[in-house]
Curated annotation (Swiss-Prot):
Membrane topology: Peripheral membrane protein
InterPro entries: 4Fe4S_Fe-S-bd, 4Fe4S_Fe_S_CS, NADH_quinone_OxRdtase_chainI
UniProt protein name: NADH-quinone oxidoreductase subunit I
Organism phylogeny: Bacteria, Pseudomonadati, Pseudomonadota, Gammaproteobacteria, Enterobacterales
UniProtKB keywords: 4Fe-4S, Cell inner membrane, Cell membrane, Iron, Iron-sulfur, Membrane, Metal-binding, NAD, Quinone, Repeat, Translocase, Ubiquinone
Positions of the 4Fe-4S ferredoxin-type domain: 48-80, 90-119
Amino acid sequence: MTLKDIVVGFGTQLRSIWMIGLHAFSKRETRMYPEEPVYLPPRYRGRIVLTRDPDGQERCVACNLCAVACPVGCISLQKAETVDGRWYPEFFRINFSRCIFCGMCEEACPTTAIQLTPDFELGEFKRQDLVYEKEDLLISGPGKYPEYNFYRMAGMAIDGKDKGDAENEAKPIDVKGLLP
């Protein structure tokens, strides 16, 4: 062992002591998760929910656009029809073990029925428990868009009624009558 090795070893020891002392009294980067809340950005995409209209009905019209837009194919649903001609999902299933939370389903949904919430705690012990059915996904409120009602906004005709004759629906505008 030479004098150079001793000096280098001593310098290394001093540098290590200095770094330990420096980091011992600095602010910690680790978050104590359950006790401390985690900061989530305003546009964070977490768990998917299905919302309802302001009158309490399901917003989803089972158009299947969300399942087509999903890049991993984790959404499956089956369309059914009520007696007045409105569509609704007979079953709606999302496999969260495959979902990548990209938000494509939310963008594709014409009725704003699918919305992503900031909830990220989806840990389960069994993989089967990560498959959510419609009953698990439906929430009681309208979500981000409280006043939006698809059937009122879209002006879609319902069986047995002309456009504008349905409940709380405005008469259609005659666009050609507005021309000079």
